[in-house]
Amino acid sequence: MRKVIICSPRGFCAGVIRAVQTVERALEKWGAPIYVKHEIVHNRHVVDKLRAKGAIFIEDLQEVPCNSRVIYSAHGVPPSVREEAKERGLITIDATCGLVTKIHSAVKMYARRGYLIILIGKRKHVEVIGICGEAPDKITVVENIAEVEALTFSTKDLLFYVTQTTLSMDDSADMIAALKARYPQIITLPSSSICYATQNRQSALRNILPKVEFVYVIGDPKSSNSNQLKAVAARRGVVARLVNNPEEITDEILQYSGNIGVTAGASTPEDVVQACLTKLQKLIPTLVVETDLFVEEDTIFQLPKELQ
């Protein structure tokens, strides 16, 4: 009997829940408009719902009237943004994920200690831009092994590395191995920079891949961790599609006869996942739905103190 195997955990992580609730509580407490620096999370469904409630998403603080409230997104901001907000008298609420904040703090600390910092990540991603702002003269971003091999540091330099929190564990492991081979003296945080939720979702997906022929990753095209989930499946030879709504699930699936895997990025709402499952069951009425639990998640991040 053909199955659709749903990964667990999937969808919202603790950092995303905190960020979304921060905007919702701010709207409840102070009313619209509430300004948000960058999309609060990279998911169109989430952003559209919050926009309908009165959130205004901006990229430049100049768009925010003086003395207004502005929320920093889960991805974090560079210190220059905080300084500009202070100069303009803006009331700020920080929804930066705690795991991203940990990396900001580490980069700042090691830069002060004289270390040169290598950041593994996508240099145009808003999270990476924010981290780089902590020590712009001491950070080098690398996106792939070729860029690692092109580094010109000495084996005598003090070197420290971190990664963007939403990377593929496969790709980052290869780059970390290359870094350590070139620079045996390089150090990092005691625990991985890749967040627990990213790791759990990738591991949960890897766990079902031997049992499926096709995978749907439900997430926004702009979501880094959703794209990395697709890459995890593709790297292991499983056909994978990134879809953001049920309409993107087509009768293409009828060309396949094996089991189907379903997972969702950390910023994907569960109602979107369920709508996609409903579409699948309409296309294949005989599908049996099965959940594959990899690990229970119980992490909770407290809301900013202004909203507790």
From Swiss-Prot:
The protein's superkingdom reads: Bacteria
Residues given in the record as isopentenyl diphosphate binding sites: 42, 75, 125, 223-225, 267
Q: How is the cofactor bound?
A: Binds 1 [4Fe-4S] cluster per subunit.
Q: Which GO terms describe its biological process?
A: dimethylallyl diphosphate biosynthetic process; isopentenyl diphosphate biosynthetic process, methylerythritol 4-phosphate pathway; terpenoid biosynthetic process
Record's keyword terms, sorted: 4Fe-4S, Iron, Iron-sulfur, Isoprene biosynthesis, Metal-binding, Oxidoreductase
Name its co-factor(s): [4Fe-4S] cluster
Give the GO molecular function terms: 4 iron, 4 sulfur cluster binding; 4-hydroxy-3-methylbut-2-enyl diphosphate reductase activity; metal ion binding
Reaction catalysed by this chain?
isopentenyl diphosphate + 2 oxidized [2Fe-2S]-[ferredoxin] + H2O = (2E)-4-hydroxy-3-methylbut-2-enyl diphosphate + 2 reduced [2Fe-2S]-[ferredoxin] + 2 H(+); dimethylallyl diphosphate + 2 oxidized [2Fe-2S]-[ferredoxin] + H2O = (2E)-4-hydroxy-3-methylbut-2-enyl diphosphate + 2 reduced [2Fe-2S]-[ferredoxin] + 2 H(+)
Q: Which residues bind dimethylallyl diphosphate?
A: 42, 75, 125, 223-225, 267
Enzyme class name: oxidoreductase
Where does the chain bind [4Fe-4S] cluster?
Answer: 13, 97, 195
- Which residues does the record give as (2E)-4-hydroxy-3-methylbut-2-enyl diphosphate binding sites? 42, 75, 125, 165, 223-225, 267
Question: Might you give the EC number(s) for this enzyme?
Answer: 1.17.7.4
Q: In which pathway does it act?
A: Isoprenoid biosynthesis; dimethylallyl diphosphate biosynthesis; dimethylallyl diphosphate from (2E)-4-hydroxy-3-methylbutenyl diphosphate: step 1/1; Isoprenoid biosynthesis; isopentenyl diphosphate biosynthesis via DXP pathway; isopentenyl diphosphate from 1-deoxy-D-xylulose 5-phosphate: step 6/6
InterPro entries in UniProt: LytB/IspH (IPR003451)
UniProt KW Iron keyword: yes
Q: Active site annotated at which positions?
A: 127 (proton donor)
Query: What is stated as this protein's family in its record?
Result: Belongs to the IspH family.
Q: Which NCBIfam families match?
A: ispH_lytB, PRK01045.1-4
State what this protein does: Catalyzes the conversion of 1-hydroxy-2-methyl-2-(E)-butenyl 4-diphosphate (HMBPP) into a mixture of isopentenyl diphosphate (IPP) and dimethylallyl diphosphate (DMAPP). Acts in the terminal step of the DOXP/MEP pathway for isoprenoid precursor biosynthesis.
Can you name this protein?
4-hydroxy-3-methylbut-2-enyl diphosphate reductase
